[in-house]
Amino acid sequence: MTTVRTRIAPSPTGDPHVGTAYIALFNYCFAKQHGGEFILRIEDTDQLRSTRESEQQIFDALRWLGIEWSEGPDVGGPHGPYRQSERGDIYQKYAQQLVELGHAFPCFCTAEELDEMRAEQQAKGETPRYDGRALLLSKEEVQRRLDAGEPHVIRMKVPTEGVCVVPDMLRGEVEIPWDRMDMQVLMKTDGLPTYFLANVVDDHLMGITHVLRGEEWLPSAPKLILLYEYFGWDKPQLCYMPLLRNPDKSKLSKRKNPTSVTFYERMGFMPEAMLNYLGRMGWSMPDEREKFSLQEMVDHFDLSRVSLGGPIFDIEKLSWLNGQWLRELPVEEFASRLQTWALNPEYMMKIAPHVQGRVETFSQVAPLAGFFFAGGVTPDVKLFEHKKLSPDQVRQVMQLILWKLESLRQWEKERIMGSIQAVVEHLELKLRDAMPLMFAAITGQANSVSVTDAMEILGPDLTRFRLRQALDLLGGVSKKENKEWEKLLGAIA
């Protein structure tokens, strides 16, 4: 009997997302329920955005939740390497195999040619897609351009008529017309694979038997299925999980809800409660109980109990469930966990240098630096009253700074200050106009330790959360303002 093997394959391009944890949990439970194996693979072919720091955050977040893997970049295994950036020769081999079999072809079109092609198609009311012009080149022309070292990509051929039947473990057979599929790029000009080729090759070579992924990938499933057929490989069973939603039913996004697992750890949520809540996203226990452990979920896991309705990720409900877990802890464990969360030596050593020179007694530390040990803060709205800026301008400054910080890839004091400075300069203001607003939003006080030092220590998740809280306190941002200010954001260096 074939051993069930599932995997999670996140991209290390940002904070570890609760959506990644959600899909990892269901893959883990499915594998363990069937006595199988769960592995971790890192999809880091986006060399511009991928970082080892983000990769480590993924490891830490999943382990904090209690999800372990039997194979992966940090633990090794018989099917490595487990980072796609280290498997380049493997992808080159299989891309060339597809070309030799006549299922893929070199494409020499420049970015300008592709833009012009799409513009012409859109002008005609057509769906933009590659028109196959490289297929008209003779073999001699193709070889000449390859020998000359001309930059090119490798594209897959796709049918233009009929439908692809996608077997989904939740929905049954889903028919998707082939004319919706583009001639997907498989290998980029830099020699690195795109998601589609790397995904299929890795899943096959790593013996993955079942793939549980988000339903946003369902429309592109025909490309994956076609690649399995081109290679002559058995495809894994496919399951497209419902997406997590905001309370307003929109797709879960960090602009409306904190989406980083790290945020919930920093806020003092219990990992058991977080896993419990993610487990209830579109799934339920046979007896409908709300509180259950990871092992209990594994023991009773059945995909037939997954609901296709978009599960709502609601922080208030998560907080309620966390309270149930918290209050059932023995008091000794409660105290121990509290100490680990708030007073661990590593965190205290980040704070101490900024506080020590500002106090005369230990009793003065809490009033000065208590905000370091809180989730949110509750500043007095009067702290946002400004001599120079109107209330609307105050909200605009804070929203633009928040957006700039959301795009910050390296969370360092100098870069944080650079983001604030960029907004201030574009609005023709001074730093002294913006910094009191930052003090109020981040610390809840008129002054404290350096606010940029505080933001660096608190981290991106809590910093952005507090800025959102402050904006809500001031009345939020209307749709009209959001649209206008986003245009302004695009002009800020």
Swiss-Prot record:
Subunit structure: Monomer.
MF (Gene Ontology): ATP binding; glutamate-tRNA ligase activity; tRNA binding; zinc ion binding
Pfam families: Anticodon_2, tRNA-synt_1c
Residues reported in the UniProt entry to bind ATP: 254
Example GO biological process: glutamyl-tRNA aminoacylation
Keywords: Aminoacyl-tRNA synthetase, ATP-binding, Cytoplasm, Ligase, Nucleotide-binding, Protein biosynthesis
Lineage: Bacteria, Pseudomonadati, Pseudomonadota, Gammaproteobacteria, Pseudomonadales
Main location as per UniProt: cytoplasm
Protein name per Swiss-Prot or TrEMBL: Glutamate--tRNA ligase
Naturally occurring in which organism (per UniProt): Pseudomonas syringae pv. tomato (strain ATCC BAA-871 / DC3000)
Catalytic activity: tRNA(Glu) + L-glutamate + ATP = L-glutamyl-tRNA(Glu) + AMP + diphosphate
Chain positions of motif 'KMSKS' region: 251-255
Cellular location(s): Cytoplasm
Membership in a protein family: Belongs to the class-I aminoacyl-tRNA synthetase family. Glutamate--tRNA ligase type 1 subfamily.
EC top class named in words: ligase
Keyword Transcription set for record: no
GO cellular component entries: cytosol
Function noted in UniProt: Catalyzes the attachment of glutamate to tRNA(Glu) in a two-step reaction: glutamate is first activated by ATP to form Glu-AMP and then transferred to the acceptor end of tRNA(Glu).
InterPro entries per UniProt: aa-tRNA-synth_I_cd-bd, aa-tRNA-synth_I_codon-bd_sub2, aa-tRNA-synth_I_CS, aa_tRNA-synth_I_cd-bd_sf, Glu-tRNA-ligase_bac/mito, Glu/Gln-tRNA-synth, Glu/Gln-tRNA-synth_Ib_cat-dom, GluQ/Sye
EC number: 6.1.1.17
Motif 'HIGH' region positions after renumbering to this chain: 10-20
